[in-house]
Amino acid sequence: MSKALIKFIRLSPTKARLIAREVQGMNAELAMASLKFMPNKGAKYIANAISSAVANGGFEANEVIVKSCRVDAAAVLKRFRPRARGSASRIRKPTSHILVEVAKAEVKAEEKKTVAKKAPAAKKTTTTKAPAKKTTSTKKATAKKES
């Protein structure tokens, strides 16, 4: 397993996380190819981090998968913009850290497992209920008893 960390990217972490979720669990070569055609600014940085992580481990891009791609918030640059009547409003320019971990793809040996089949369920028979007897109201029943 190898890692790559790119720090202080001038990109909002929330925007970068949208792209980071897309590549988790993908083959590194496939992830870099799909990021190449994304129009987002963060796609370029994440693709760069993936290729750096692959190179750090000494792997080939087709033999590793992206185990995790994490985007953390970094320092926020604060600027001021002049506004009306001598006031100013604050502008926040967020930055982020991108951490990518790649691991060698595990080739799973297919094991044949015999699964016991369930016995087919018995057919359900529909039964119709006999109509319920009509009950007389309590006032009428007490009047009949008295007479």
Swiss-Prot record:
Keyword Ribonucleoprotein: yes
Name used for this protein in its record: Large ribosomal subunit protein uL22
Subunit-level organization: Part of the 50S ribosomal subunit.
Claim: Iron-sulfur is one of the keywords in the record: no
PANTHER family documented for this protein: CHLOROPLAST 50S RIBOSOMAL PROTEIN L22-RELATED (PTHR13501), LARGE RIBOSOMAL SUBUNIT PROTEIN UL22M (PTHR13501:SF8)
Low complexity biased stretches: 117-140
Protein encoded by which gene: rplV
Any single GO BP term: translation
One Pfam family it belongs to: Ribosomal_L22
Molecular-function annotations in GO: rRNA binding; structural constituent of ribosome
Region (Disordered): 110-147
Keywords from the UniProt entry: Ribonucleoprotein, Ribosomal protein, RNA-binding, rRNA-binding
GO CC annotation, single: cytosolic large ribosomal subunit
Protein's organism: Campylobacter jejuni subsp. jejuni serotype O:6 (strain 81116 / NCTC 11828)
Known function: This protein binds specifically to 23S rRNA; its binding is stimulated by other ribosomal proteins, e.g. L4, L17, and L20. It is important during the early stages of 50S assembly. It makes multiple contacts with different domains of the 23S rRNA in the assembled 50S subunit and ribosome.
SUPFAM superfamilies in the cross-refs: Ribosomal protein L22
Family under the similarity heading: Belongs to the universal ribosomal protein uL22 family.
